Amino acid sequence: MIASKFGIGQQVRHSLLGYLGVVVDIDPVYSLSEPSPDELAVNDELRAAPWYHVVMEDDNGLPVHTYLAEAQLSSELQDERPEQPSMDELAQTIRKQRQAPRLRN
């Protein structure tokens, strides 16, 4: 069984770039189409670990969907960041929906 380090709705940081993001989905292993070696230089162990769909903001403040390995992320300890309120709002909305899901027809 593969355990993920981060949860849906959790705020995380890109370990190398420092960008703040919110986890919106988790894949237990790398699940996108098979990349060429030039596109993704990762080993098999990294591909077998959890991968995360993370929404981050670009330099213009626009949301960007990213697909990152668990090793590329670190925990974000603060609950609120005044410099990026949209990431706080997104995380809060996702957590609320997970606590009280709406029924769909």
UniProtKB/Swiss-Prot annotation:
Question: Looking at the record, which segments are called Disordered?
Answer: 74-105
SUPFAM superfamilies, alphabetized: YccV-like
- Give compartment(s): Cytoplasm
Matching entries from InterPro entries are given as: Hemimethylated_DNA-bd_dom, Hemimethylated_DNA-bd_sf, HspQ
User: Which chain positions lie within coiled-coil regions?
Assistant: none
One of the entry's Gene Ontology molecular-function terms is:
DNA binding
Q: Which Pfam families match?
A: YccV-like (PF08755)
Spell out the Basic residues composition-biased ranges: 95-105
Main localisation: cytoplasm
The Gene Ontology biological process annotation of the record reads: response to heat
Q: Which UniProt keywords apply?
A: Cytoplasm, Stress response
* Record Gene3D superfamilies: Hemimethylated DNA-binding domain
* Similarity comment: Belongs to the HspQ family.
| Function in brief | Involved in the degradation of certain denaturated proteins, including DnaA, during heat shock stress.
**Protein's recorded name:** Heat shock protein HspQ
Q: Which organism is it from?
A: Shigella dysenteriae serotype 1 (strain Sd197)
- Upper lineage ranks? Bacteria, Pseudomonadati, Pseudomonadota, Gammaproteobacteria, Enterobacterales
